[in-house]
Amino acid sequence: MNALTVKRRLPVLLFLFHISLSSISSNTILENDFHSSFVQRRLKGHERREIQKEILTILGLQHRPRPYLPEKKKSAPLFMMDLYNAVNIEEMHAEDVSYSNKPISLNEAFSLATDQENGFLAHADTVMSFANLVDNDNELHKNSYRQKFKFDLTDIPLGDELTAAEFRIYKDYVQNNETYQVTIYQVLKKQADKDPYLFQVDSRTIWGTEKGWLTFDITATGNHWVMNPHYNLGLQLSVESMDMQNVNPRLVGLVGKNGPQDKQPFMVAFFKTSDIHLRSVRSTSNKHWNQERAKTYKEQDNLPPANITDGIMPPGKRRFLKQACKKHELFVSFRDLGWQDWIIAPEGYAAYYCDGECAFPLNSFMNATNHAIVQTLVHFINPETVPKPCCAPTQLNGISVLYFDDSANVILKKYKNMVVQACGCH
């Protein structure tokens, strides 16, 4: 989304959004700035639908997710909240601390993401967690020496490349200090009344007194499932003592289906969106909006630059709002859109917008390009021939959104160019 598109879309959305125009704090007025508040009104039905449709398009979603019985206190959502907080720390260094950057409180018993996972996160655009779908936990049977797990990867976004995948299972403390070998297998083929064909994926050594989350690398298996969904027959776990004897996973402290909600086993996968797919999505979105509003833009080009608050403030106050191009407050609330049931965080974010005059002479703080300076000068000499430059974003930052999909899986996605960091004349 280029700067001109952002400039044009914000005024349209501004009158529809449930927003507040205010100064950074109620007791602070910025130099040469005049902010006004107005009585907020409830969105009409068609306004809400238009806003929801547009934001869903920006978020890359074809429809509003309707998760079945989403639960934020389970292990997978808690882990994803921890990753979300890690991303927010980086975003807070890139922009002013705002409402959208509030960290999410976590269950104290839940371990933090490892350095390796933070490394995966730094190179990923999307992170998805998957809950275990196996209902009958084999560990409930006294003589069972294996656990089975199944994960549904059918909702992977088109065009996303899986860069890393992990299987995580919690181990409680047990009162012995024996050493065990935990092995994860990919189920290749099931057989009636026989053991399935298995392929060893990863293994690690544990001690009885060890406590915490065990992580296994299943990247190759995850890629195989994404490319060949019909081969997704799940994982199988087994435990052996050092003398090669099978051991019930429950006896070494491994938590299964009947364990606490915040210690349930799950899978997490990291994805990178290909540049080709990203350009295709942007092209389709921009084409739709250009067709819908080409006529409106043409009419607007023939009008003098209008302040974003025209129609909101009375004429007597509007004359004070004629100011130089700069950044203004704009807050988008997901809660006001009725999305609090599927968006975990943030509840909203400060998007900001650019507005103001790009009139001759352009001051240094207007972040004007050389082209804009020349265009302003020509407009000053001959206003009928060349229009004024536009006030538009010169720097945009991203945000991260944590949400449930239709299957109640938790997704953490990074979205670029969502927050105006600086404005200038272009």
Curated annotation (Swiss-Prot):
It is found in: Secreted. Belongs to the TGF-beta family. Disulfide bonds join 325-391, 354-423, 358-425. SMART domains: TGFB. Glycans are attached at residues 177, 307, 367. This is Bone morphogenetic protein 7. The keyword Repeat does not apply. Residues 1-22 form the signal peptide. It comes from Xenopus laevis (African clawed frog). GO terms for molecular function: cytokine activity; growth factor activity. GO terms for biological process: BMP signaling pathway; cartilage development; cell differentiation; ossification. SUPFAM superfamilies: Cystine-knot cytokines. Its main location: secreted. One of its GO terms (cellular component) is extracellular space. The gene is bmp7. Gene3D superfamilies: 2.60.120.970, Cystine-knot cytokines. Keywords: Chondrogenesis, Cytokine, Developmental protein, Differentiation, Disulfide bond, Glycoprotein, Growth factor, Osteogenesis, Secreted, Signal. Growth factor of the TGF-beta superfamily that plays important role in various biological processes, including embryogenesis, hematopoiesis, neurogenesis and skeletal morphogenesis. Initiates the canonical BMP signaling cascade by associating with type I receptor ACVR1 and type II receptor ACVR2A. Once all three components are bound together in a complex at the cell surface, ACVR2A phosphorylates and activates ACVR1. In turn, ACVR1 propagates signal by phosphorylating SMAD1/5/8 that travel to the nucleus and act as activators and repressors of transcription of target genes. Homodimer; disulfide-linked. Interacts with twsg1. Residues 23-282 form a propeptide.
